[in-house]
UniProtKB/Swiss-Prot annotation:
Catalytic reaction(s) noted: RNA(n) + a ribonucleoside 5'-triphosphate = RNA(n+1) + diphosphate
An MF annotation (GO) of this entry: DNA binding
Encoding gene, per UniProt annotation: rpoB
Pfam families to which the protein is assigned, alphabetical: RNA_pol_Rpb2_1, RNA_pol_Rpb2_2, RNA_pol_Rpb2_3, RNA_pol_Rpb2_45, RNA_pol_Rpb2_6, RNA_pol_Rpb2_7
Protein name according to UniProt: DNA-directed RNA polymerase subunit beta
Amino acid sequence: MIQQYNPFKKDAFDILLPDLVGIQLESFSTFLKKGLIEQLRDFSVITDPTNNLELRLLVEQYKLKRPRYNEKKCIRRACTYASQLYIPAQLINKKTGKVQEQDVFLGEMPIMTSRGNFIINGSARVIVNQIVRSPGIYYKREIDPKEGIKTYSASIICNRGAWLRLETDKNGFVWARIGKVRKVSGFILLRAMGLTKSKILNSLRHPEFFQKTIEEGDPYSENDALIDLHSQLYPERPSTLFAARELLKSKFFDPKYYDLGKVGRYKINKKLQLSIPEDIRVLTPQDILTAIDYLINLEFNIGTLDDIDHLKNRRVRSVGELIENQVRVGLSRLERMTYKRMAESHPDALTPASLINPKPLVGVLREFFGSSQLSQFMDQTNPLSEMTHKRRISCLGPGGLSKERAGLAVRDIHPSHYGRICPIETPEGPNAGLIGSLATHARVNPYGFLESPFYPTKNRKVFKKTLPIYLSPDQEDELRVSPGDLLLSSSGKLEGKTVPIRYKQDFSTSRSDQVDYVGISPIQAISIATSLIPFLEHDDANRALMGSNMQRQAVPVIRPERPVVGTGLEAQAALDSGTVIVARHDGIVSLVDSNKIILRSSCGSNQTKVDSVGLNFDYQIDRYHLQKYNRSNQDTCINQRPVVHQGEFIKKGDILADGAATVGGQLTLGKNVLVAYMPWEGYNFEDAILISQRLVYDDIYTSIHIEKYEIEARKTKLGPEKITREVPNLGDYVLRNLDENGIVIPGAWVEAGDILVGKVTPKEDLDQHPEGKLLRAIFSEKARDVRDTSLRVPNGVRGRVVDVRRLKGSELPSGVNMVVHIFISQKRKIQVGDKMAGRHGNKGIISRILPRQDMPYLQDGTPVDMVLNPLGVPSRMNVGQVYECLLGLAGHFLGEEYKLIPFDEMYGKEASRGFVYSKLYEARKKTGYPWLFDIANPGKSQLFDGRTGEPFDQPVTVGRAYMLKLVHLVDDKIHARSTGPYSLVTQQPLGGKAKHGGQRLGEMEVWALEGFGAAYTLQELLTVKSDDMKGRNEAQHAIIKGRPIPKPGTPESFKVLIRELQSLCLDIGIYKIDKTKKGQEIDLMMSM
């Protein structure tokens, strides 16, 4: 019996993590309850041009119908999980007083599943959270590089409408720039808004600075200022007073065209210390006047500049808000269309349903969910990757940054990220720093700002019994905050006179009695994937980043295993990912099989009532259906296994069934294997890995992969394509796996080239003879020629057909009669070329599989499973792997599992090393193996060569490490081609495995051969082996018949070059002298 062991139990952190996918579920719930109603309310009244007809939408009474199919059926039928949206509408004829009421269909709204994702066209998709500049006002300073003069600017950013930029120049003028058009004087803008000169000057703290700007444009009336503003902004248009007023109104004062949003209003009020009501979401003259006053004050060193990378100036747009923005776009199009119909149709012929066309809204939502940069194909490699995808935060996408324009400042870690965005987990490539992950305890407040929880502290006393207080980034700036890995005394007070703190974006130390707040957990600053790395504090950040990312790429193996050394977050990660089944009520398991679990739960009380005869009554039945061998988006296998037994009593919240990568409700991504850090005959050079045959024979790293193949039968100009067994020119053996309809039988074993679905396509009839026409007239279409376009198993694929799905009817796109999906399952054992990794960024490729008798073995005769290169540790500085493997070894012999939360140095210096050594010593005492803890070489042991039985020269570090098999499998990458498709233009082989391409001899390869003067080899590679069409055919025939290979001809790409030069009107030709015809010239371009 393996017991779980927490080394620091008495000081263990009560880490109650929030729901890890709550950010998605809460945001979508808010959208349905508030956001959708708000957007509909803006378009709730539409009036026709004559003002006689009025269409009213009763938005609070909107209805969402139950989706037509459940989630499972939507995936099977390749359709969208969505609800129909209906709104009660009234059409009021003001002339006659007639009112028509009707429920109007507004389109289908995709609905989020209980796991926080959407199902679009049968595939799981995630809407990624976007982090953008918050609406508000931002001040910044610019210094002229030549003269060193400082100028200041203020940008007013809105949700919707034109940006306004106020700026000072080196001559002391104040300017305003609206959108991207030319700038105007700040005084003209204020006068055009109706402010008098005296009001302006009285409101400024330093009116003398603004005097210069006033003198430039004085004397001015309000009307003069309006016309001047219009003429300066749009000199090509005639400037009238009405046009000028309308321009100013539409730019800043009309809620339809300009919206600061509640966040923008809140930020402007806070920065400029105004008290304008939150429901006024347009700019006011007071806003602009106060903004200019603040700008002038900066010239006198009064006020503060803004850091745009601070999280108080960036907000998160979650799924609800992103859909809300799309709904607004769709509704504005729908409003225009409805207005047009009202104007064009007779009032008596109109009904609410005939006026409203749902197409604009449906089209916008389809485009957003199907092709937006923020709507992504869900990463379903394992439960962790699924959950991390839902917690991802991206700077990219519409309204955000682009990776080409993003500088280093945006990508960098900022002090305000602490406890909100993980400083470690981010991609490695061009998106580094632009895509992050939410920290474990972070949450998004109603304004969209990220908050982190802290315990209040007073006079060194930390109030851990109270609920933690969530602080926003701007609140935290003004407080002294200590990290969560400080050791407290038994009375709950901070120990030591000084403690590390963060104050005003600076990391320093402070007296412990001055601390305001303390973090609630040591893992508060990092993401869920990073917090699954044990001994994280001993790893370099770059390697921890790789470890976090590679855990998401781990393939679930057939028999997963809990890590001996974990961090305690595995259970929460598995639970919140939604891959395990949890009991909804207390009850007794009445039936368990591989497909379902039936729970008989008591109603109204925790106990099932029993009558006098002993029969149960007053209970309800809960059915839980298990997912069996379903395909994920990444072709891995989704499978659930029951963990309860019939008759067992279950409490609410207990685990009923495990997922593909969970054991006992805990996340299990890999296997514990015996590793040795030593070189072995050069086979582990440069991160290569040497493994034992045991891992292959015992299916230690065997995984199931399910691939999907589909084929469509379409309508063509020559008639419909047919799915049939009657395929021309094929024998019975080739068709052995097909049923009478021409579709493969589930359970059939198929190899590369086998037919999965027989299909014939009508061929264009070239036979225009009278006999052919007569035959067609007699036998109708039957005599028409068809060609074989069957779906075959691609090269390199073999496996068992596990499922066949036929789709017919109205759900298919137009022009398609039938779609068939075939699912082929493969069992993939570990093999040379597969990629493996630990949790510390220690990755490598398998270079050789040795028989277990040849592997190095321990002093008790156990052969090791894996040999890693010791040089992969010192330079990479990921020493956490050494601690993990040694503690894993001790845990294996002691029968214990360990949950070690990262950052344990608060328990004393070298706490990790002390704990690992103590456990090794304990294992040595229990087993009687002195080599488990050798005081001369702690952590190392004498190993013996399996081939000779001789001991190795030096003691070797041996331990049990948790190693993962990654999704980068050699079977998916290896590719070979003898003959295959060519590009039509250049006649060169296509590229890539997907197109069955070949290798290309690029420029650098040509240079290499030129450098060695290999002229004939080069000529052969550039002609016969590449794109000399005539030459390659002749060469093939010569090889088959055993004749000498003829001389090469002209490459096709050279002919393409000549054609391109001819298209530039250059008269260039290439000719060959024919020696057989008296030296006659032959135009090679004509022989194409």
